[in-house]
């Protein structure tokens, strides 16, 4: 279960509970929504002149925000907040995530508990952030990396890097590998969404694993 958040408006707490119990969102996802919604309402407290000018954002009390105040949030407030986030060095992906959290929250107020008749995030569409191409090490760079491993656990770290270089796995996938996932010259990898795939272990991987 997610943490018992107590420093946010009641409606936001209700929404996080809904995400947990009804939508079965992961604790990590819920915590992300919590942080983004908390940041938005700290901003709104400043817009509403309900926070002292010299109060640091992290010290602004949100627990007294009412349903009526939340119902006054407008499309302009949302757009201004996204601009405020950009001015505070939030990149395109971070702003898109914040908008997604707000869209979900206000959608919940409109369609699940009927507190609002209109969603202020409707028709706000951020441009898609540019996707950077993945960067790969050349063969010579890979060899140089392996030759320069300095560790008290050399065999382990060498094996890890060989697997990264040859199997295309993520760190989160690597740390979930168990002995039972190895079979002959293959390894079962569990990726995002618990999707499993079999990856062939080439001779370099097999040698590094055997040495480890």
Q: Positions of the model-derived regions?
A:
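Conserved catalytic core of the tyrosine transesterase superfamily
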Residues: 1-212
């Amino acid at each position: 279960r997610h943490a018992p958040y107590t420093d946010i408006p009641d409606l936001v707490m209700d929404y996080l509970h809904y995400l947990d119990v009804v939508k079965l969102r992961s604790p990590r996802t819920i915590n992300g929504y919590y942080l983004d919604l908390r940041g938005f309402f700290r901003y709104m407290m400043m817009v509403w002149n309900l926070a002292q000018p010299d109060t640091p954002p992290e010290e602004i009390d949100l627990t007294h925000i009412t349903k009526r105040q939340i119902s006054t949030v407008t499309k302009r407030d949302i757009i201004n907040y996204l601009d405020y986030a950009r001015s505070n060095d939030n990149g395109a992906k971070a702003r898109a995530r914040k908008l997604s959290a707000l869209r979900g929250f206000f959608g919940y107020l409109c369609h699940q508990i009927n507190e609002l008749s209109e969603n202020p995030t409707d028709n706000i569409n951020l441009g898609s952030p540019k996707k950077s191409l993945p960067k790969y090490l050349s063969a010579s760079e890979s060899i140089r990396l392996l030759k320069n491993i300095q560790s008290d656990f050399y065999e382990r770290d060498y094996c890890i890097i060989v697997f990264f270089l040859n199997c295309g796995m993520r760190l989160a996938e690597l740390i979930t590998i168990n002995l039972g996932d190895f079979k002959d010259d293959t390894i079962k990898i569990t990726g995002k969404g618990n999707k499993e795939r079999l990856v062939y272990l080439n001779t370099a991987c097999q040698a590094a694993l055997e040495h480890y």
